[in-house]
């Protein structure tokens, strides 16, 4: 999205300024605020997406449904909703925190660094997926149990943040519980 920024964070994870999103993601990316979201359909299937080849970091890599950066004055729920519309063309409901304290630092093969305080959410998709080709090159609906097994067996095939999110036992259980609520 044109004009999108990241909120920079200090050592206490407090806002410390803003920087244009593409300028922020470099070989020495400063700590900044982000979010990650796992989307599910009413049957409890998870939407795994493959990042566009045009992405600056981890192009072509399979990852969780959607990620992004909240903008100044925007709640996480508003940011998740905005990015779901922009990246996947979907409307969502039932946004729930999965791993509010998640943070990570990872270096892509091209040297670009992700360095984020990145709360993780789950949400239910309530419309058809219409991906933005600049963001998503492919997607699949899969059972969560199958996805979690694939992440454990072949972590190299997925984004590092998705792998780390799934490795957290509390986050895994929260995802499983979210799916159980969807399935009734």
Curated annotation (Swiss-Prot):
So what EC number does this one have? Answer: 5.3.3.2
Its Gene Ontology molecular function terms?
isopentenyl-diphosphate delta-isomerase activity; metal ion binding
Q: Which domain of life is it from?
A: Bacteria
Fetch the Gene3D superfamilies from UniProt. Nucleoside Triphosphate Pyrophosphohydrolase
Q: Which residues form the Nudix hydrolase domain?
A: 30-164
Give a yes or no for keyword Cytoplasm in this entry.
yes
User: Where is it chiefly localized?
Assistant: cytoplasm
Segment forming the signal sequence: none
Annotated residues that bind Mg(2+) are located at 87
Record's cofactor remark: Binds 1 Mg(2+) ion per subunit. The magnesium ion binds only when substrate is bound. Binds 1 Mn(2+) ion per subunit.
Instruction: Give me the Gene Ontology terms describing cellular component.
Output: cytoplasm
Q: Where is the active site?
A: 67, 116
Subcellular locations according to the entry = Cytoplasm
Keywords in UniProt for this one? Cytoplasm, Isomerase, Isoprene biosynthesis, Magnesium, Manganese, Metal-binding
Metabolic or biological pathway, per its Swiss-Prot or TrEMBL entry? Isoprenoid biosynthesis; dimethylallyl diphosphate biosynthesis; dimethylallyl diphosphate from isopentenyl diphosphate: step 1/1
Cofactor (UniProt): Mg(2+); Mn(2+)
Q: Which reaction does it catalyse?
A: isopentenyl diphosphate = dimethylallyl diphosphate
The residues listed in the UniProt record as binding Mn(2+), with positions renumbered to this chain, are 25, 32, 69, 114, 116
What InterPro entries does UniProt report for this protein, alphabetically? Answer: Idi_bact, IsopentenylPP_isomerase_typ1, NUDIX_hydrolase-like_dom_sf, NUDIX_hydrolase_dom
Recorded coiled-coil stretches: none
**PANTHER family linked to this entry:** ISOPENTENYL-DIPHOSPHATE DELTA-ISOMERASE
| Function recorded in the entry | Catalyzes the 1,3-allylic rearrangement of the homoallylic substrate isopentenyl (IPP) to its highly electrophilic allylic isomer, dimethylallyl diphosphate (DMAPP).
Quaternary structure and partners: Homodimer.
**Listed NCBIfam families:** IPP_isom_1, PRK03759.1
| Family that this chain belongs to | Belongs to the IPP isomerase type 1 family.
Q: What is the protein name stated in its UniProt record?
A: Isopentenyl-diphosphate Delta-isomerase
This protein's gene is called idi
């Amino acid at each position: 999205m044109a004009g999108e920024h990241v909120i920079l964070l200090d050592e206490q994870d407090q806002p410390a300024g803003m920087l244009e999103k593409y300028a922020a993601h470099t070989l020495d990316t400063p700590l900044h605020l982000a979010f990650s979201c796992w989307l599910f359909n009413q049957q409890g299937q998870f939407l795994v997406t493959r990042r566009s080849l045009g992405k600056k970091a981890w192009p072509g890599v399979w990852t969780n449904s959607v990620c992004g950066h909240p903008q100044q004055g925007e709640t996480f729920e508003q940011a998740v909703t905005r990015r779901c519309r922009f990246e996947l063309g979907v409307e969502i409901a039932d946004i729930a925190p999965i791993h509010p304290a998640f943070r990570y630092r990872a270096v892509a093969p091209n040297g670009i660094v992700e360095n984020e305080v990145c709360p993780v959410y789950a949400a239910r998709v309530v419309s058809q997926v219409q991906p933005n080709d600049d963001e998503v090159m492919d997607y699949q609906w899969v059972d969560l149990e199958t996805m979690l097994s694939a992440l454990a067996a072949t972590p190299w095939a997925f984004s590092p943040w998705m792998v780390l999110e799934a490795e957290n036992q509390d986050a895994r259980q929260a995802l499983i519980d979210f799916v159980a609520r969807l399935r009734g």
